[in-house]
């Protein structure tokens, strides 16, 4: 899994050299931000069900046809609603993995890769998940550096879906 630190190490190793001062400084900066990222991951995890349920409600509010149209990809049944919250939970979980890893590696490997094909295969609208992620970003309750860390990953996924 790629993170800024592992990429710097790989580059230095491929060039047969030690890490430069700027690479060491960047790595140290990452460690300083790690506490905030872990705080964000911990908070998102402990509030996950509330955030997921709120995000699903925001999707149903903005796209009411999702609860009125029948089909496996819609939330017109209890099973459909369970799938919707499961999928939103998956997005949120992968964001917490990225926070812990300190880079977009988990997002790239487990979420972004193949996202377009998956949505097309299951006839899922990316706009549903964009709305869900925007809701979570606006309502996660984080502040300061923890919010900055989390919001960067939410923006990354939202941009990938847009």
Swiss-Prot record:
Q: Which UniProt keywords apply?
A: Antenna complex, Bile pigment, Chromophore, Cyanelle, Electron transport, Membrane, Photosynthesis, Phycobilisome, Plastid, Thylakoid, Transport
Q: Where in the cell is it found?
A: Plastid, Cyanelle thylakoid membrane
Residues annotated as coiled-coil are none
Q: Name one GO biological process term.
A: photosynthesis
Family matches, as InterPro entries? Globin-like_sf, Phycobilisome_asu/bsu, Phycobilisome_asu/bsu_sf, Phycocyanin_a
Give GO cellular component annotations, separated by semicolons: cyanelle thylakoid membrane; phycobilisome
**Subunit organization:** Heterodimer of an alpha and a beta subunit, which further assembles into trimers and the trimers into hexamers. The basic functional unit of phycobiliproteins is a ring-shaped hexamer formed from two back-to-back trimers contacting via the alpha chain subunits. The trimers are composed of alpha/beta subunit heterodimers arranged around a three-fold axis of symmetry. The phycoerythrins also contain a gamma subunit which is located in the center of the hexamer.
Gene that this polypeptide is encoded by? cpcA
Q: How is the polypeptide modified once translated?
A: Contains one covalently linked phycocyanobilin chromophore.
Q: Indicate yes or no for the key word Thylakoid.
A: yes
Taxonomic lineage per UniProt? Eukaryota, Glaucocystophyceae, Cyanophoraceae, Cyanophora
Family per record? Belongs to the phycobiliprotein family.
Q: What does this protein do?
A: Light-harvesting photosynthetic bile pigment-protein from the phycobiliprotein complex (phycobilisome, PBS). Phycocyanin is the major phycobiliprotein in the PBS rod.
* Binding locations of (2R,3E)-phycocyanobilin: 84
Q: What is this protein called?
A: C-phycocyanin alpha subunit
Topology relative to the membrane, per the entry?
Peripheral membrane protein
The organism named in the record is Cyanophora paradoxa
Q: Which domain of life is it from?
A: Eukaryota
